């Protein structure tokens, strides 16, 4: 019998879920060498990028549950199915996770007795506990990716317990021994960070407040060269007192900031989106756009947050808490259209107020196999059927991978 050509093997396996690929890697050294090769890793990422998903992280009573759902492919979709991935127990002390290319970074997650930075692939159930940074306890952490060197890096800021605020710590994932190192190029000193980070084309951006007279600036960290820059973002100064509703996003390849507020049109409550787009990166020119969303009875009456912007240019709004029914809204600024998509089975067992969980959503989620190391979360390999806390169906374990 003729052996199967490697090209055909790569093509077949590139269409499988990431968790199944990881399971097949354990069958033999031959399979492992093929499925860990850079050629396959890039092919798998390309396939996954062509079918982006919306990733949900639901936190409830110290337990994290991860789901994903396909992003709409047309303007007429009204509902979408939900895929359950994995869960683990862990409390976040202060800052929520950041997301880059399929990975989540929790700066201070209590998985055991102590809190430590944790990198997690919610789709595959792989995670890695990073060395603790005692002197930077409760500092915000950011995850970035260098598309040229194909490296993920974690940036931990010096704030708030360092006298040398300009010195941050950097860790490169995928190395034999994970260790933090001080950056050689000093970061411009600032009082505190004000937002989560967004990585665009190898540059990590986050909003910060200056020392002295309070003003907003954007801190830029080049993930490859590890150089810092900053530029003025005074357009956000009116939100210094409360930046919780502000999110930095990638809008058609440009750094942008979005927040929202409620308005009133007669007796109806309206939702107004405000978006600042960095139209000229060299001159640091921001252009402001204001949109009043089309009337939607559900959106006008629920708590929601901005999740990001899809590759099609839709601004995604997600309900903040688990409930039934659970909706995601896609607003297209160019067409001034609002698409409501019900995520089926989400929150079916959490109707009671006391059981509601906080939901965080991340757009354009892809399955990425570029970080191979880590431990498998127990819930991903359990041979016991477990009831997903956020839906009415029993989730089946992945029997293809049972190696702890």
From Swiss-Prot:
Transmembrane segments: none annotated. Residues 1-47 form the F-box domain. Pfam families: F-box (PF00646), FBA_3 (PF08268). It comes from the Eukaryota. PANTHER family: BNAA05G37150D PROTEIN-RELATED, F-BOX ASSOCIATED UBIQUITINATION EFFECTOR FAMILY PROTEIN. This is F-box protein At3g57590. It comes from Arabidopsis thaliana.
């Amino acid at each position: 019998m003729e052996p199967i050509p490697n090209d055909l093997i790569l093509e077949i396996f590139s269409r499988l879920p990431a968790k199944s690929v990881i399971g097949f890697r354990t069958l033999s050294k031959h399979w492992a060498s093929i499925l860990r090769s850079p050629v396959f890793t890039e092919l798998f990422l390309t396939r996954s990028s062509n079918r982006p998903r919306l990733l949900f992280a639901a936190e409830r009573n110290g337990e994290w549950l991860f789901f994903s759902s396909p992003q709409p492919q047309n303007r007429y979709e009204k509902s979408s199915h939900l895929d359950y991935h994995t869960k683990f127990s862990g409390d976040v002390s202060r800052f929520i996770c950041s997301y880059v290319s399929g990975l989540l970074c929790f700066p201070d997650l209590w998985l055991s007795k102590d809190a430590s930075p944790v990198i997690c692939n919610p789709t595959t159930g792989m995670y890695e506990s990073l060395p603790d940074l005692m002197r930077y306890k409760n500092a915000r952490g950011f995850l970035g990716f260098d598309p040229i060197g194909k490296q993920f890096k974690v940036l931990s800021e010096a704030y708030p317990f360092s006298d040398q605020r300009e010195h941050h710590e950097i860790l490169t994932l995928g190395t034999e021994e994970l260790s933090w190192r001080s950056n050689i190029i000093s970061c411009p000193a600032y009082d505190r960070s004000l937002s989560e980070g967004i990585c665009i084309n190898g540059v990590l951006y986050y909003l910060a407040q200056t020392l002295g007279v309070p003003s907003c600036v954007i801190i830029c960290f080049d993930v490859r060269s590890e150089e810092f820059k900053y530029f003025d973002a005074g357009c956000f100064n009116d939100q210094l007192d409360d930046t919780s509703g502000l999110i930095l996003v990638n809008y058609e390849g440009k750094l942008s900031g979005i927040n929202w507020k409620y308005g009133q049109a007669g007796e109806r409550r309206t939702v107004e989106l405000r978006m600042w787009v960095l139209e000229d990166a060299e001159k640091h020119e921001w252009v402001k756009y204001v949109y009043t969303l089309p009337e939607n009875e559900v959106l006008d009456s629920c708590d929601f947050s901005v999740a990001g912007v899809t590759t099609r240019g839709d601004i995604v709004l997600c309900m903040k808490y688990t409930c039934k029914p659970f909706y995601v809204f896609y607003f297209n600024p160019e067409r001034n259209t609002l698409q409501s998509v019900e995520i089926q089975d989400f929150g079916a067992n959490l109707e009671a107020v006391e059981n509601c969980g906080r939901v965080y959503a991340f757009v354009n989620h892809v399955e990425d196999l570029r970080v191979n190391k880590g431990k498998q979360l127990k819930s991903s390999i359990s041979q016991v059927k477990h009831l997903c806390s956020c839906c009415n169906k029993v989730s089946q374990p992945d029997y293809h991978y049972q190696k702890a």
